[in-house]
């Protein structure tokens, strides 16, 4: 299928809402920094403008699998990551330490990246989407499988949740694992599963 990127992506800042800053989201954010720098070096006038959304705080169990360090335990994930990259690369990206909520209007040069880990969260995101509009990338993984889908609600490129409605089926029972050590978590998911998913984004 041939797809043409809208002109607005080339002449305006590309607005990115990254929802979820856990195992996959924290790695996606580091990739967005590199993408921003690459776009600027290739002549894009603005690069990316990113807002990261996540109400969670860093816990001890996050260290190792996610991009956090011991001194950040107890702090909001979004604040840790956004402050780090803003300071290191002179960016002005935004941290929202809360659940994602809808905007009244999405410019044509908008991208939503969902890196959440539950059907309930995906269903909430889906409820905010207009009939067609922003590009939506859904990246998720289980113990041994992952998915990465993109869509904008058009007939040619439907939203991820139109392609795989089971992703937002809240009637399906979720796997609810308690927080555990890095060693214990490796018993049910490989160390680089999140990295693979983030790279696909």
Model segments located where?
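Conserved beta-strand segments of alpha/beta enzyme cores
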Residues: 49, 92-94, 135
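N-terminal Rossmann-like NAD(P) cofactor-binding subdomain of oxidoreductases
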Residues: 44-45, 53, 116, 140
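Glycine-rich phosphate-binding loop and adjoining beta1-alpha1-beta2 segment
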Residues: 46-90
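A structured beta-alpha segment of the ubiquitous adenosine-cofactor-binding alpha/beta core
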Residues: 73-109, 116-123
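Glycine-rich adenosine-cofactor-binding loop
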Residues: 12-43, 51-59
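Glycine/serine-rich phosphate-binding loop and adjoining beta1-alpha1 elements at the start
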Residues: 1-16, 189
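Oxidoreductase and adenylate-handling cofactor-binding alpha/beta cores
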Residues: 199-201
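E1/E1-like adenylate-forming module used to activate ubiquitin-like modifiers
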Residues: 105-197
């Amino acid at each position: 299928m041939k797809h043409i990127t809208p002109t607005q992506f080339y002449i305006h800042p590309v607005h990115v809402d990254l929802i979820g800053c856990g195992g996959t989201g924290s790695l996606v954010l580091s990739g967005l920094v590199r993408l921003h720098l690459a776009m600027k070096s290739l002549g894009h006038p603005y690069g990316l403008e990113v807002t990261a959304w996540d109400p969670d705080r860093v816990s001890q169990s996050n260290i190792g699998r996610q991009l956090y360090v011991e001194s950040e335990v107890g702090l909001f994930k979004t604040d840790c990551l956004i402050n780090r990259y803003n300071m290191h690369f002179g960016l002005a990206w935004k941290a929202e330490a809360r659940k994602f909520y809808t905007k009244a209007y999405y410019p044509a040069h908008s991208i939503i990246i969902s890196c959440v880990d539950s059907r309930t969260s995906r269903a909430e995101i889906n409820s905010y989407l207009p009939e067609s509009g922003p590009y939506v990338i859904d990246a998720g993984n289980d113990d041994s499988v992952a998915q990465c889908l993109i869509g904008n609600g058009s007939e040619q490129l439907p939203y991820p949740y139109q392609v795989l409605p089971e992703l937002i089926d809240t009637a399906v029972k979720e796997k609810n694992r308690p927080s555990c050590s890095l060693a214990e978590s490796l018993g049910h998911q490989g160390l680089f599963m999140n990295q693979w998913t983030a790279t696909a984004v």
